[in-house]
Amino acid sequence: MTILPKKKPNSSVGVSDHPDDPDRRTGSDPHQHQHQHSHGVRPGARPRASPPPWSYQAAPPASREDRRTESSSRPQQASPPPVGAGSSGGPGDATGMACVSGNRAELSGGVGCGGGMGGCCSGPGLSKRRRQATCSGGVAGGGTGPGAAGGGGGGGGGGGVGGPSPEQEEGAGYNSEDEYENASRLQSEDPATVEQQEHWFEKALQEKKGFVIKKMKEDGACLFRAVADQVYGDQDMHEVVRKHCMDYLMKNADYFSNYVTEDFTTYINRKRKNNCHGNHIEMQAMAEMYNRPVEVYQSGTEPINTFHGIHQNNDEPIRVSYHRNIHYNSVVNPNKATIGVGLGLPAFKPGFADQSLMKNAIKTSEESWIEQQMLEDKKRATDWEATNEAIEEQVARESYLQWLRDQEKQARQPRKASATCSSATAAASSGLEEWNARSPRQRSSAPSPEIPDPAHSDTAAKPPSPAGALALSKPPSPCAPGPSNQACVGPDRPTSSSLVSLYPALGYRAIMQEMSPTAFGLTDWEDDEILASVLAVSQQEYLDSMKKNAMHREPSPDSS
């Protein structure tokens, strides 16, 4: 904290500016403490109209009683004593000190506190220490004690008459007690005790209210830093807050100048310095400027003072904490965002940006997770498809190999069966005589173009062997299943050479007939197709047998 040099107090209290009116007195020593917030700011909205000008005439007893009643209802605010019968109102009388009463809108003039009554200061700017020190040094027995520091208040003895001092007029107009060098010397408490109280204060505020005290830099701008942290979220914006506050005070100088004892322009110019402290006047101005209540906490969980704006609303208040009667910190509610409230931003919702960022982050995370899961599913599906394809290929290969083995096995089985059947037929037909009757098949096929040339016409006219008839009339032989049993039936008395010559053809036909038509892409054979194939085989066998018989029956030329 920057301590300004102490100026000598001014003892201009009690000097009448109007000699013709003995009841007019100056009420010039409010000595408003910068950080003591026990003054009675009237809560709620107030009209923008400026208050009436300062009246130097002493109020009647009835009005003072009303003010005392109103002031006594507010905490930590003393009321000025009523005007006594023995008090003198002349311009030369020595008054104890100026008594400030009421809230911001009510300031009373100084009253002489003689007749053995001690002078007492009250008002929004005076701290307990100052009031106690002033009241303890009050007048007794018609004399007056020392006045309030910095505001003026002459000390007189004997008859109690004190005149204005040029040395005391220089320091008139300071409103804050901590602007004096003796402010630091007023701290009589033990530092360890103060530290313990501060720790208890922070702990109680956090446990009961959930608030957190945010430390501000101690450079004389702590109040503006705390408000900047509440409004802008950055304590380094204190210069902007100070500038706006001073501009607001200048625009409403007709109202706020009633609470400043010094020249208002000088006061504003001094407060524009970055190392100059702020007090209750600046708090009220900022409450109206941001239209947010300002709550001040000190060693307790309930605010000791609340400054209200002009219009009532439901916005979160600006919370500051007051420490050691000299420093302000910011009180933050971590569960509710208040940054930006009061700046006049349209459709502004505190914390909406953080919520939007959180939603966007969650959405992006979900999309990334979904894409990752889809990629994993595709990988698993690709592996599954490749595995299925490999399995299908392996099954097809094994099935094809098994089919080839089955075909080879089936191709070997009909050859053995046909050879056995042919040997049995040759043994059975060796004892039969040749049958010269012509078969019906031969009759029907006589005019066929397949008859041999005219040289063998006589051979064709002979009755053929009834092989075709036997092939059609006899039931299938069990030696060869299916339509191949006709291949086992030959002429009644064929020679062994003819049977042997038929073995390859019969074996091939048997293999073809044993195979399923589905192997060739065909359906099951019908009866007509089976009958046609049997007739063709029978005809071919008959023709072959006729040729062989004709060759054996031709007599040799030398035998005749």
From Swiss-Prot:
Compositionally biased residues, Low complexity = 417-430, 437-448
Which CDD domains does the annotation name? OTU_OTUD5-like (cd22752)
- What single Pfam family name could you report for this chain, choosing any that match? OTU
Locate the region Disordered.
1-100, 141-190, 411-496
Name all OTU domain ranges: 211-334
Please identify the protein, giving its name as recorded: OTU domain-containing protein 5-A
Tell me its family.
Answer: Belongs to the peptidase C85 family.
User: What is the species listed in this Swiss-Prot or TrEMBL entry?
Assistant: Danio rerio (Zebrafish)
Keyword Ribonucleoprotein assigned to the entry: answer is no
Q: Which UniProt keywords apply?
A: Hydrolase, Protease, Thiol protease, Ubl conjugation pathway
Chain residue ranges for the region called Cys-loop: 216-222
Q: Report biased composition (Gly residues) as residue ranges.
A: 141-163
Q: Where is the composition biased (Basic and acidic residues)?
A: 17-32
| Record's keyword annotation contains Protease | yes
In this protein, the active site sits at 219, 222, 327
In UniProt terms, what function does this protein have?
Deubiquitinating enzyme that may function as negative regulator of the innate immune system. Has peptidase activity towards 'Lys-48'- and 'Lys-63'-linked polyubiquitin chains. Can also cleave 'Lys-11'-linked ubiquitin chains (in vitro).
EC class of this enzyme? hydrolase
Name the Gene3D superfamilies on file: 3.90.70.80
Name the Gene Ontology molecular function terms of this record. Answer: cysteine-type deubiquitinase activity; K63-linked deubiquitinase activity
Q: Map out region (Variable-loop) in residue numbers.
A: 271-281
List the gene name: otud5a
Task: Please cite one Gene Ontology biological process associated with this protein.
Answer: protein K48-linked deubiquitination
Q: Where is this region: His-loop?
A: 322-327
Known EC number: 3.4.19.12
Q: Which reaction does it catalyse?
A: Thiol-dependent hydrolysis of ester, thioester, amide, peptide and isopeptide bonds formed by the C-terminal Gly of ubiquitin (a 76-residue protein attached to proteins as an intracellular targeting signal)
